[in-house]
Structures are given as C-alpha cells and as structure tokens.
Amino acid sequence: RGLGDVYKRQNFNEVFFTDVRVPDSQRLGKIGDGWRVSLTTLMNERLAIGERPPPAFEEIFQLAKEIELEGGMAIEDGGVREKLADWYVDGRGVTLTRFRSLTALSRGQDPGPENSIGKAITGKMRQDIASFGMDLMDISGAVFDMDNAPMRAMFQDALLSAPSGRIAGGSDEILRNIIAERVLGLPQDVRVDKGIPFSELVKKEKA
C-alpha cells in the first residue's frame, strides 16, 4: 500500500505479510546468523543511499555561479562561499569513507558501521543544499516546473524528496546511535534482550 508524499508520489509503501513461510532452501547464511545477514543488507543499502545524490556540491556550486544577488554574483558572496566550502569538505569526507568501504568489500570483508556515517551526512546535506539553493533563487525558488525553474527544478524536487532519504535505510537518530556505539565505542543502550536469539524470545513470549 503506497504512502504518498506532499507531491503525491509514492516512494514508500506498507507491505503486509500474512501466513508467510520461507523454505530453508531460500535461507541466507547459517541458522542463528540472521542478524548478521540483516546488518549486511542494511549496510549495503546505506552505502548505496549515501552516494551523494544530486543536488550535491557540484550542483549548488554551478547555481551559485549563475545566480545574481544585489551585490554581484552569488559565488562572490562571502557567506555563500563559506557554505560551499563546508559542503565541499563534507562531500570529500563521505567520498573517501565510501572508498574505504568499497576496498573492504573488494577484500571479502563484511560492510562495517562506517557506511552509516555517509548516509547520516549526505541525507542532511542534500536537504540543506536544496533549501539553500531555493533561497538563492529568491521567488524563482517557488516555481516547481522543470521547463521554467532554474536547473530544471532540481532543488525544489530534492527539498520534497530529501526527508524520505533520511528515513530509508535507518533514520538519522538510529545512524547516530550506531556511530556512537560501533564506531566511537561509547556505552550501549541497556537492553534486557541483548544476546538472546529471536527464536528464544518468541518461545518466552508464547510460554
């Protein structure tokens, strides 16, 4: 069942499973190893989602060269250049982190928690860039028409779709928790079910 956004597009869905049985021949990994398989799937998804979809630095840099402000071109404004510099540094950091992840995968290693870093940064950065780009356009930023808006309404479209990207594959809050616990080594949340297989939890629930 589709879940529409403010633009009436359906990028999210509710999926219902009733009386589903998966045969053992379709099992991935060893018995009791489902959590590791699930994490591998999630980390690969986060690696893909964190691939800096446009608009990224290149697009906002191009827009700043085309937009004229009261004091001159946007690219010449000190405040604009400061934001561009921040996004450039963040983008390079994400790219290099992705290279590390891809190198590990090429060596047969499991994807690690560092993939959460890229997704956490790019999700917010894309939303911030889209919002800032629309601010630079002034009243043209309110035009959501590919044929008439600057850069074919790329920034307007991104502002509407970016929030969903910050949910898919794990919300910002979940990603920060993973980075804190698995990358920085901070104390984990207290969990009474930690270390207990899901099958055992189900048995206790039925008991």
Question: What annotation goes with each model-predicted range?
Answer:
Residues 20-34:
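Long, acidic (Asp/Glu-rich), low-complexity accessory segments flanking structured domains
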Residues 14, 43-207:
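Alpha-helical interface subdomain recognition
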Residues 27, 36-43, 47:
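Short, exposed interaction patches on small structured surface elements
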Residues 2-7:
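Short, small-residue-biased leader/transition segments that mark boundaries at the very start
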Residues 1, 24-27, 50:
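Short helix/loop capping segments that flank catalytic or ligand/cofactor-binding pockets
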Residues 8-9, 30, 48-52:
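Short alpha-helix boundary/capping segments
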Residues 18-22, 39-42, 183:
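Short Ser/Thr-interspersed hydrophobic loop/turn segments at strand-loop and sheet-helix junctions
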Residues 9-16, 31, 36, 161:
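A generic structural signal for well-ordered coil/turn residues at beta-strand boundaries
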